[in-house]
Amino acid sequence: IVPEREATVHVLSGAVKYGATVFEGICAYLGDEGRLTVFRLPEHLLRLQDSMRIMRFEQDWSVSHLTEVVTDVIKANELHEDTHIRLSAYVLSEGFLDATAPIALGCLAVGRHDKSLSDKAARAQVSSWHRIEDSSMPPRIKCSANYQNGRLATIQARTDGYDEAILLAGSGK
């Protein structure tokens, strides 16, 4: 385990140059007995494995190994509060666009401080940006590159004075 501030990824890696990163955002909640319980960890890890498969990442991490990584990082950070975990797999090589290995794994666990809009009404704007299509860049996988779509829509909405953006498919639905 490397401290967050010491973790590095080369600027010419596939992860940085091409957005070849997949991840899961996972929540852990502090129970009445003072123990953290990770919400639907097996499901998150299976989706991460699916994302890596679709992105053709060459790796053989089992759900058991990934569970151990998450557990070890939570313990190392000595967290005793609701926690956000970000487990990422990324192309580490400085190779070309088609690089599928080596793959590195990063896991960050930090206290969860929601800035949720649940306690107030949100003002939303239908964006001029369209939701990406599954046949182009599958939004069902959590690939960092896919988030540029929502990022552009959010920037537009906030610039225009709204809290959130609503993205419609190309068909307008």
Q: Model regions: which residues?
A:
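Helix-start/capping segments and mature chain N-termini
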Residues: 1-61, 65-72, 76, 96-173
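ATP-grasp fold ATP-binding core
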Residues: 82-89
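Short, internal active-site loops enriched in acidic
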Residues: 90-95
